[in-house]
């Protein structure tokens, strides 16, 4: 007995519809899984990026803190501002140092030096002899054998007196309106974010005995406590001031 062709066609159509429905479910599940995977991957990449920024930014802060005081006379405090979330200090970041090749009078603005190359206009400079120091600002880029100041020194210096750059640095937490907190790095007036998405930043100041101090003259170490993003585990480190 031959069955009607319409029955076979109906069965085939039902099977196709069931298969399509099953395929749609599988496709939906697969799409959901891919979306979830992409979301997790993006979160992991964001976390890795934050951690990399944290490591690099913290390394820069540590290295520059070690130089605190190298851009000042030896009897001046290495740190000029001690805050829980802000620190300001002077350092000779590029180790730019030279000496006077001739005596300089108190009214002199043009300093004869051994080498003034790569000393940029606007930088603070310090001149020191055995018993006194003075500060000035470069009126223009340094030349091979001279440095020009914006104003006279006010005191005389003998030949052989040391001249060095004093970079002014400041690290602080900035919270843009409605945005995440950033750790900012300011050098000689220009500032930029060095670590983003900061959720905790704390500075503590220690003397040579490892005791907390609020007196800049006695600070020899700085403890840094930093947390980035929503991580429970942050970074805690102590930095000794090499310049003191």
Describe the function of each predicted region.
Residues 2-66:
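Aliphatic-rich helix starts adjacent to a transmembrane/signal segment
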Residues 14, 18, 26, 99-100, ...:
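Hydrophobic aliphatic residue packing
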Residues 23, 69, 105-107:
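Glycine-centered small-residue hotspots that permit tight backbone geometry or close packing
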Residues 39, 48-49, 63-66, 80, ...:
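Short linear sequence signals and composition-biased patches located at protein termini or domain-edge surfaces
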Residues 58, 136, 237-241:
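Generic detection of short hydrophobic beta-strand segments and adjacent strand-loop junctions
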Residues 86-211:
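Type IV pilin-like appendage domain
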């Amino acid at each position: 007995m031959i069955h009607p062709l319409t029955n076979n066609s109906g069965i085939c159509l039902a099977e196709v519809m069931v298969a399509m429905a099953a395929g749609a479910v599988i496709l939906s599940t697969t799409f959901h899984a891919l979306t979830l995977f992409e979301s997790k991957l993006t979160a992991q990449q964001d976390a890795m990026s934050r951690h990399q920024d944290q490591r690099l930014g913290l390394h820069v802060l540590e290295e520059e803190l070690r130089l605190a005081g190298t851009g000042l006379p030896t009897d001046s405090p290495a740190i000029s501002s001690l805050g829980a979330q802000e620190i300001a200090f002077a350092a000779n970041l590029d180790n730019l140092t030279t000496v006077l090749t001739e005596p300089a009078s108190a009214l002199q603005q043009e300093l004869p030096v051994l080498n003034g190359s790569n000393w940029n206009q606007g930088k603070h400079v310090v001149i020191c002899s055995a018993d006194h120091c003075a500060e000035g600002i470069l009126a223009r880029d340094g030349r091979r054998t001279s440095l020009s100041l914006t104003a006279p020194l006010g005191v005389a210096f003998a030949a052989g007196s040391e001249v060095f750059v004093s970079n002014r640095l400041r690290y602080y937490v900035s919270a843009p309106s409605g945005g995440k907190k950033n750790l900012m790095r300011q050098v000689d007036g220009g500032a930029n974010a060095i670590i983003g998405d900061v959720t905790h930043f704390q500075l503590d100041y220690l003397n040579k005995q490892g005791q907390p101090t609020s007196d800049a003259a006695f600070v020899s170490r700085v403890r840094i406590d930093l947390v980035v993003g929503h991580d429970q585990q942050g970074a805690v480190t102590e930095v000794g001031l090499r310049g003191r």
